[in-house]
Swiss-Prot record:
This is Formin-homology and zinc finger domains protein 1. SUPFAM superfamilies: Formin homology 2 domain (FH2 domain) (SSF101447). Residues 256-267 have a biased composition (Polar residues). It holds the Pfam family FH2. It comes from Caenorhabditis elegans.
Amino acid sequence: MMLASSAPTAPSLLPPSSQPSAATTRADDCSSSTSPTNTSASDASMEMLTSLMNGAVAAAAAPGNALVKQESPPLTTPPLFNPDLALLQFSQLFQAQQAMVQFHNQQKQQQQIIQQQQQQQQQQQQNQNPSQSQSSSSDRKRSYPCTFQYCVICQKDVHSSKLPCHIRQCHVAKPMFQCPACDFTSTYSKNNVKSHMVSLHGLAGDPISYMDKYAGQVEEFMKLCFPNVRGRGRPMQGRSSPKSPTSPTQPGRRGSQASSLPSRRNTVSQNDLLATLQQHQQQQAAFHPLRNLRFNPLQSIFPAVLANNNNNSVLATNKHVNNFLIKQEESEVPPITMPMQDLKTMLDANSSPSPISLSSSIIPIQPIKPGENAQPKYMKSLDWTILNDLQMKGTVFADCRSNMELYAENIARKIENTKAFQSFVLSDDMRTVVEEVRSRVSIQLFEVMFAIHRMDIKVLNQNLVDSLLQIAPTNSDAQLLRKMENLSDPNEEFLLGLTKIDHIEEKLETMKHMYRFPEQVELLKENIIKYEIAVKVLSESRALRNVMQLVLAILNIGFFDDRQCLSINGFSVSDISSILSTNTPSGQSVQSILVTILKDEINLDLDELFGLIDVLEKIENDDVNSVAQDLMVLDDKTVRAEKEMEHSGSNIPLSEFVENAKTISKERWEHFKSLKTSIERLTIYLGSPLPRHQNLDAHSPFNNVLQMLRSLKTAIELDDASDDHHINVSSP
């Protein structure tokens, strides 16, 4: 104890007033290290605290050292080594480290929670089922509310997932997939054709696809059949338009729009964002029908609401509904193209006229010749033909309305100086016709207008349609009628009412075609059957074959004395007239020898032979080429009816007529192709095979045989008359 108390105090290098307080310095260091983000300061404080503690332990152990012999004064503890202050500094440092660890753990937990929420949402959207959608229906509106859609043309419900298949199978009705090894096709199922390829041919791979060929037609039928559906079977409600900028860029499964949206951390939740987008899309879809809405003064007469089998009223937003009045604001009629394959003429020896294809080509045709319509009926000074809007497309006059703006004013000033313009004049003859039509109409004018607009043949009979077509004002006549200020004549008022019907001539022509199509098709069928009977009779007639062989024998024996008929193998029946008039070396004509043989040969049935004359006379004045031309005319009228149906909107009776007309026309074309093949075989049978570069004269074989039979019959009758006269003269 004496040694410890007498130990000398360590000398100080600084004066007492200038030495800094160790407690103050250490306190400042500790206070600087309490920040949870200053990690370097906390590390330095730990090192300083460790060194100070080691020094304190060494100082406390010094008095107990028995080897120290030097005496020193009593040891006084500096303020730095105050136990309370050291414990305070250590606790502050420990709290700073714990705060840093807790902060980093919270960050990691938040990231994990966000990732788990995203994964759960994606998994729920991918694995959702009808039961889950029903349970969540109270919380949010279903994204796919319509399970079935109503087909306007078929008038039945179709499942929403089967809309394109329904279009391809029921309306387009064209082979979409074909087996590459055979003619097996399917209108909608690719798997059926693949199964056929594997099971019957052992082929792997995909079948031949025609989907792209009929894609445009499928889209057009989609608009007609399901006017309240957008895209590939997607209802308008709760769905974004395919062209909307908010639509996902990648096609995904149903209800996967949320998964395609980028996640935004610490900004807006995904549910809020999806709800906002969905609300915006619903508002846009609800506002869309009101964009092009036009006032219709006849809404009380013609309702603007359509009902379907789902007991849902659908607003008739289709532009074709209740639009039979002409829209004066439309300056141009949209271009109408009638896609169909080019029909080859009957003179082509290699191929037959192909049946009409209304949607397999993009080549526009002109089924209306210039002057057939749009020709003014009430302007006698115009004796030249006028083109309609369809015929004007692609001509030198196509851009006249835009290019003549610079010259129109100058031309108008020069013409206005004369003050002489064409006016509407109702001649006496036309006035009589209009009065007769008005007297035959038993309904009011607006009912006539609506019947023409709907092309309703149940309201207007065929004679009335023909009469209305005769007096219907064209576009030029309508311009003059509208300029008239005072219309006191009821006939002029009746004509002015007809001018308000859009495409009135085309609609009346369509109704006329609907009336006359069955009769014309039946007439064509009868003509084809008459030719088929003539071909069959000539091909199977035993008497005709014997006569041709007798002529061949006469030529061989009469000219070459060849009783085995080896010199001349045969001849063309087309030359039979010149052959019969040829004289043999004996001075006898071939016809005289043949007539003598026919009279003496009892095995030949002359009644059967000359009975062919009655069959051939039935087609003597007909022409096979006219059958093909009549079929083409009917097809053109069907094209006009189909285009008018597309322009006027959905019309179920007209749609059924067009489909039926296409089917019947296809059958008649097949019938005609079969007839042409039979005529070609008959031509070969009669010894007139044609090379590929020579055209077939389908009427020649029948005329040649008919002339030969008439000549033989006349010669036999004359010979019989001369024999009777000789018998009468020689008898007593």
